[in-house]
Amino acid sequence: MYLIEEDDLALAQYTHDDDHDMYLCWQDEQTQKGYNYVFDQPLERFKKTDITRFPFWVTVTDRTLDQRVGVLRLGLDEKHPDLAIWIYPQHRSKGYGTRACRLALKFIFQHLPYQEIAAGCYCDNKHSLAMLEKVGFSRRPEEDEPEINGFTVEKTIQLAFGISKAELNG
């Protein structure tokens, strides 16, 4: 059963049945670089993640292909949670991220108590930057976070973005 659907794209509640696809996505180096996180968990530990802690965690399905193409999840911040997105490697650069993000925000703002959603990405992640712009996120430079790159050990900055309910519907 889908939480929300539009044309051929649908979002369903994430379950542990989705863990294997998500785990494979985390094995992808580009995924790890996109999150500045070297992923080295074994599958059995990954499957023990308490998915009920998160207010919104969905699997993205292309209904025409009858395939899972990615995942979106809200972080745990109670006021401005971060919306994270993972499009599986074989489905990238096909517009799924933009469409799924818009659909997720529509659902979140209609059904959850948030007035603003945050997002972040790194300046070298051109696809995510383009997606955030297309969806309507605005830069929030005052919220940028300096970090150490987990791959190069050089300084980097996670760029901060946000979108309000009014901005999405405006």
Name each model feature, range by range.
Residues 27-48:
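Conserved GNAT-fold acetyl-CoA-binding loop/helix
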Residues 48-61, 70:
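A short helix-loop-beta-strand connector motif used in the catalytic cores of GNAT acetyltransferases and
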Residues 41-45, 54, 88-91:
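Juxtamembrane/interface motifs at transmembrane-helix termini
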Residues 1-28, 60-170:
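Acyl-donor (CoA/ACP) binding surface of acyl/acetyltransferases
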